[in-house]
Amino acid sequence: MKVVKSLKSAKSRHPDCQIVKRRGRLYVICKTNPRFKAVQK
């Protein structure tokens, strides 16, 4: 999982990526291509 400062660029890497909020943190999840997962620090 990649740790990034801005999730805007992480979301635009794949069309299926979506932003979710869990436990006060923002995550990018991608069901079709899980290597695009990211979390905002």
Swiss-Prot record:
- Recall the GO molecular function terms of this protein's record: structural constituent of ribosome
Q: Fetch the InterPro entries from UniProt.
A: Ribosomal_bL36, Ribosomal_bL36_sp, Ribosomal_L36_bact
List this protein's GO terms for biological process: translation
A single GO cellular-component term from the record reads: ribonucleoprotein complex
Top-level division of the source organism's lineage? Bacteria
Sorted keywords for this record are: Ribonucleoprotein, Ribosomal protein
User: What S-S linkages are listed for this chain?
Assistant: none
Q: Which family does it belong to?
A: Belongs to the bacterial ribosomal protein bL36 family.
HAMAP family attached here?
A: Ribosomal_bL36
Official protein name in the record: Large ribosomal subunit protein bL36B
Source species of the chain: Vibrio campbellii (strain ATCC BAA-1116)
